[in-house]
């Protein structure tokens, strides 16, 4: 297993380099360092001297990927790509274009992101699995039919509708919770209730429908018919046998998401004014802050690779027949 983990981590290096190169290319196809300087300076008629000063202070006065004027390794190392992207492998995030330390911002904003992502993940998993088991238990009945119809309807509604509608009804009309904002400690609870409920509601349809399909596939297998033939009740068969064997495909979609919880939610954090990593990324994109964008893309890629690795390792815990080679 150790050899497998090491091999997967080595495979991740070229993938991360490719992701960094793709992010770098896409960003600078749309923008140039001069465009970034003019946007950050916020002046319509900015002087060329001010642009050059801004670029020099932030390291954007170098060539993008190849420095002809440098000697030896400097042709590669004294470039924007090397200094802004490859240093991420040493966890050197550098500074944002506004001068703030990106590493400090990530540490500060990780707490609010987890404060909303963890409840959404745990509550959403419990609710969707419970509903899916309920529909599987009452399969081929009116409850199952209308449950599937409700799932499809919920899937068809945009997340923006849930957010805007929830803010209008719960906060503006009923005045139950604040419409947006965030506070530290236990005071954060009143700001998190609405975004957590909305996030769970937005994901119920697709997740419940997927889990229901998995449970129905397991119910049709031979071991379930054998369990029924032994006289076990339908509830016992469903919870003791079907749920256990359905954990392998469920883990595929669940474990891989766990590391990504640190990244927060882009839409929810932005609409509800939560100072997490999701809103931090959106603000950086709007400000064309490449330093922050490439850092967040890199962290997201690393967490996704870690999630895939954890998924493979979790298979061996759920199913002893699985061997990693």
Predicted stretch roles:
Residues 2-3, 110-143, 159, 183-325:
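Alpha-helical transmembrane segments of integral membrane proteins
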Residues 6-16:
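N-terminal signal-anchor/signal peptide hydrophobic helix marking the start
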Residues 9, 50, 54, 77-93, ...:
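Hydrophobic alpha-helical segments of integral membrane proteins
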Residues 12, 109, 113, 149-152, ...:
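Residue-level signal for discrete positions within transmembrane alpha-helices
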Residues 16-21, 152-163, 253-258:
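Hydrophobic alpha-helical membrane-insertion segments
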Residues 16-76, 174-188:
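Hydrophobic alpha-helical transmembrane segments of membrane transport/permease proteins
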Residues 25-34, 87, 149-178, 198-200, ...:
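Membrane-water interface segments at the C-terminal ends of transmembrane alpha-helices
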Residues 63-129:
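An internal, D/E-rich "acidic patch" concept
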